[in-house]
Amino acid sequence: MPTYNFAAGPATLPRPVLEQVQRELLDYQGSQVSILEISHRSPVFREIYQQAKERLLQLMGLSADEYTPLFLQGGGTLQFTMVPLNLARDHHRVAYADTGHWSARAIEEAKKLPDLTVDVVTEAGPDFAHIPAVPDLPADTYDYLHITTNNTIMGLAYQDLPQTAVLLVGDLSSNFLGQAYDFSSFDLIYAGAQKNLAPAGVTIVVVKNDYLTEDHGLPSMLNYPALAKKESALNTPPVFQIYFANLVLKWLKEQGGVQAMDELNRQKAGLVYDYLDQSKLFSNRVAPDSRSLTNIPFTTGKADLDQRFIKEAAAAGLVNLKGHRLVGGMRASLYNAMPLAGAVALRDFMHQFEQEI
């Protein structure tokens, strides 16, 4: 019986990549040492790092003449602070769209900075059923607009990016390279890798080169220009995670790239949503035009029945379906590495469970 891991993160990883890592773990490409042991200053790692940068930009349709990828530490959570420190320079006033828990966390952290005004310019409301429209923002008032493209807990996602006159910053942690956006619309993107790209421990930042030219005297580890100058190696970078991410980027290209993953993810999500929409037992409260492709929360409406479903699903090989503690119920995370067969198995088990109730 196959096992499908629906965890929200750390999440399922591509099987071919895991197998390659297993083969190379004790002796990386004839070097006689493990990838876990190589120096971050060695030619071996520098080649891995350059490959990862090039593959990432290629998958995103971006040019190295305009954007620089960074492979950092501290998770998306550190970016909640680094973004305003580096970008809120002209007006010291920033705009945020609040569409769920993680956007609220970003707002909370930005508000801790002195001499910075943080405006919540749009919010999803208490039911978190719709992605709200973003109002027109004057370029002479705000330094940037921050959005969270996908909220894992509530299951909301932007299908279309807001058009804005100010810089656009995106937290893409949970649908990074799994949903086809025009990445050139962003001035800065960040994403924790532990959902779609690698094990936890590396955070991707892709920033326009325009914002790497001036050093504002920030502490070095919080300073994008300083980190870019040292190619993400002001301190020892997470070598293994970058190596792993490089292999996943190669795998993504072999699958057909971001557009192909978007199409597959829509197919997977569609199977689950179509069942939920006709079910008399299960429900999902998010409006169809705001639904996440990668994180689908659902519930029976009864806590004891939810727990029974989670337990019986796990026994059937469908693991980590428990919803986030803030909302309860169930949640199916269908990241890039989740095969179509996993979504089919979940839909079929939901049908079986409902028939037996």
UniProtKB/Swiss-Prot annotation:
It is found in: Cytoplasm. GO terms for biological process: L-serine biosynthetic process. L-glutamate binds at residue 41. This is Phosphoserine aminotransferase. It catalyses: O-phospho-L-serine + 2-oxoglutarate = 3-phosphooxypyruvate + L-glutamate; 4-(phosphooxy)-L-threonine + 2-oxoglutarate = (R)-3-hydroxy-2-oxo-4-phosphooxybutanoate + L-glutamate. The gene is serC. InterPro entries: Aminotrans_V_dom, Aminotrans_V_PyrdxlP_BS, Pser_aminoTfrase, PyrdxlP-dep_Trfase, PyrdxlP-dep_Trfase_major, PyrdxlP-dep_Trfase_small. Pyridoxal 5'-phosphate binds at residues 76-77, 102, 152, 171, 194, 235-236. Catalyzes the reversible conversion of 3-phosphohydroxypyruvate to phosphoserine and of 3-hydroxy-2-oxo-4-phosphonooxybutanoate to phosphohydroxythreonine.
